[in-house]
């Protein structure tokens, strides 16, 4: 049942509403039904489309999506074309400005370098280009000065025309003829002004065309001058080559004949005369090229210069230390090239090759020198042969895991290196290389310091244990050396001790040639050869240490047993005596005793 039916039922029940509905016309009833009509909600239809269209206006046309998209595309293309045209106009303006600047620079360079060229080459100076440039400047100045008075005349004429027109307007109220005259005068003045403007524009166009023609002529002259310079260069080179060949032939012939000192001098003088001319031409060419090369590409060249200078200076800096290392200089015990900017990998390899047979250098430091695996492999070869280097620093370089493993494999044949540093490399070593390092270090017993932070905990612990093991071995060796040195000193003392007087008397029965004035009665031997007195007895040995007390003194107080403490002697009770007797007795010794009545 719809809501309209319910409403009609209510209306039928209410007589007043029924009477009102009867009075309504059919059109009004339709409007009322439309207002009361409510569409049942449908879940598949969106909420915005469930309500009926309440607009009274009719649609002008059907919505066409393709037409709308085409219109948008056309509009965007038009906008893009406008932007492109604006950009092109800006680029053309910038290019014209740059060309004008280049032409001015070329003119200035020509003015400065034109007379020098002519004087050096021994030719007459070409003044045509200079005259043209001066005439051009004068024309430009004259054109500017001519344009200004013409423009001022036009402005004055326009002002006069305005004044006349105002006067004519005042007189127009009196006579109608004045108006016709004013109109005629205005037209005539406008025609004159337009004719003058067109004349000015024509003059400007003519001047521009003349400027273009002059620029073309100058370019042609430049091309011709460059061709002439190249031709003169080629001819000079040919002359040099031909002169050199002829000079060599003449000298050989004259040496064979044994004559020709004067001829050789003449040939040398001719060659010397030809050389300055060619040198001057080369200088002039270089001068003409320099102003043309001062373009945006110019600033890049100074940056290349210092780098080349540093590369060339690097070998000169490190030549002396390399020679000292090769010659085994005893004063050079360290080779430190840390943080050097101009050093290369080739120089580092040369250093390692020189250190291979060196027996003086003990420290080789090349931190932050951009060393790569090639240098690491060279160091590995050097460590196999060198037995004096004790410290090696390779921090902050470009060595990978392969180069580091090669160095550690070389340590298996090296027993002198005690410190190795290779921290902060560009490439990460990784877990595999760390495990390999730990395996290789197990067979090395001399490395004590390792400058590297292990990422994995396993290799880190094993390497720390191995380094502590090596430290203990070194300490034990040191103690053994100290003991051996002490024993050697004791043996030397025994050998150097002076023998006693009794032993001297036994071994030498002859009297000494220099008798002492006061002979001591103790040293005088008895007649009949009595035996010497026995040596004194050795001192008594120290009492043996009690091991329990020593253990208690070394162990902490918390771990000591209470029974170990020495307590004062106490008297035993009868109960204690009884218990002690029971513990010491056997079952055979015990007798059966009747149980007392109280306990039964």
From Swiss-Prot:
Residues where Phosphoserine is found: 12, 85, 135, 555
Region ranges (5 X 4 AA approximate tandem repeats): 508-527
Main location class: cytoplasm
Positions of Sequence repeats: 165-180, 181-196, 197-212, 213-228, 229-244, 245-260, 261-276, 277-293
Tissue expression as described in the entry: Detected in lung vascular smooth muscle (at protein level). Detected in thyroid and extraocular smooth muscle, but not skeletal muscle. Detected in heart, aorta, skeletal muscle, colon, urinary bladder, uterus, stomach, and small intestine.
Start-end of Pro residues biased regions: 510-522, 532-543
Keyword presence, Ligase: no
Top-level taxonomic group: Eukaryota
Domain WH2 intervals: 574-593
Subcellular location: Cytoplasm, Myofibril, Sarcomere; Cytoplasm, Cytoskeleton
Ranges for region 8 X approximate tandem repeats: 165-293
GO cellular component: actin filament; cytoskeleton; cytosol; membrane; myofibril; sarcomere; striated muscle thin filament
InterPro entries per the UniProt record, alphabetical: LRR_dom_sf, TMOD, WH2_dom
Name of this chain's protein: Leiomodin-1
Organism: Homo sapiens
